[in-house]
Amino acid sequence: PGDDLGARANGEEAPMRRRLRVGLIGTGPAAEALGTMEVHLGPKADQEVYTYENKEHWEGRVTYSLLSEEPLLSAVESLAIAAWRALGCRDGGRLDIRLDATGAPSFIEANPLAGLNPGHSDLPFICRFKGIPYDELIRRIVVSAIARAGLPLTATLSKRIAA
């Protein structure tokens, strides 16, 4: 898998087309994809890149959709999980994937400290599309960190985290 990941990482030779964001949770073998969202730049958006302006003032500029087409979804999420693990990312974050003109996915960047603003951050958007409430996203990140630290997750602590 490492050699395959390297061959597909940041392949900027071919023009990149579709913009995908993969939400991830967990650390190491426990890491999993929460879902994959596609970013669609509208006519009012900066077109070359997903700029700060596009992201922060997305209404009227950008639309988002949940990626569901197979086998693309499986390929994208497998690539994202492999990159997340290879980079040693932990607990929760986001990876950006682009598809080239042939439809091949390439890893572009990792955001292991992804924004968590429910009104304009990609990771909470992905969770909302997947039906995962915001408080559940935060709970999963905290539970991952507690498990990674080797601390016991008592029933009392679990209830406090969920509250």
Task: Identify what each model region corresponds to.
Residues 1-75, 104-106:
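Phosphate-binding site of ATP-dependent enzymes
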Residues 10, 14, 67-163:
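ATP-dependent carboxylate activation and anion-phosphoryl transfer catalytic cores
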